[in-house]
Amino acid sequence: MKDIRIGFIGLGGRGYGLLEWAVLPQKEQVVAVCDVYEDRVQKGAELVEKFGQARPAAYTDYHDVMKDESVNTIIVATAWETHVEIALAAMYAGKAVAVEVGGAYEIRDCYDLVEAYEKTGTPFMLLENCCFGRREMMVLNMVKKGLFGEVVHCAGGYHHDLR
């Protein structure tokens, strides 16, 4: 995929933060923004314009983003309970999709996502926030350079209250 043309779905706190990140490098184009709240849609569209991109299409229904032929990639940052539904719609629409965590509520959801990938071949990624950060990438590079010797086991994590 040479030209990444993103449709952002979900522009609350986390989604807006991801949108800020996406428009900074300007390697990709944000061509659509979507949220159920019109004020968030307008704020998102204004942010994209502020960083020198064309004003994106603005939607309040994610189904409209799926129909938008200018979009080839979807970022889902909505409420958790809608992640799988929107991700599946994106995959079946042939749009690569990245979903903010949590990716699924039930095991069946996970199987549905795998099945959609197997049927469509559409790329899917969880946007886990502790995989590609500066610290994580630093440790990965240290491992690849052999600074720890042979790594036979590693564990890590963090805890925060999501209430």
Which residues make up each language-model segment?
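N-terminal Rossmann-like dinucleotide-binding module
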Residues: M1-F51
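Beta-strand-loop-alpha-helix segment that lines the small-molecule cofactor/substrate pocket
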Residues: T73, A79-W80, V84-F132, G146
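Conserved SAM-binding strand-loop segment of SAM-dependent methyltransferases
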Residues: R55-D61
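Predominantly a Rossmann-like dinucleotide-binding segment in NAD(P)-dependent oxidoreductases
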Residues: G10-G12, T120-M125, C130-R163
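Short hydrophobic/charged patches on amphipathic alpha-helices used for structural packing
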Residues: Y62-M66, L140
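Receiver (REC) domain switch-region micro-motif
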Residues: V33, I74, C154
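Conserved acidic residues
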Residues: V31, P56, S70-N72
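Short, conserved SAM-binding/catalytic segment
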Residues: G44-Q53, D112, A116-T120
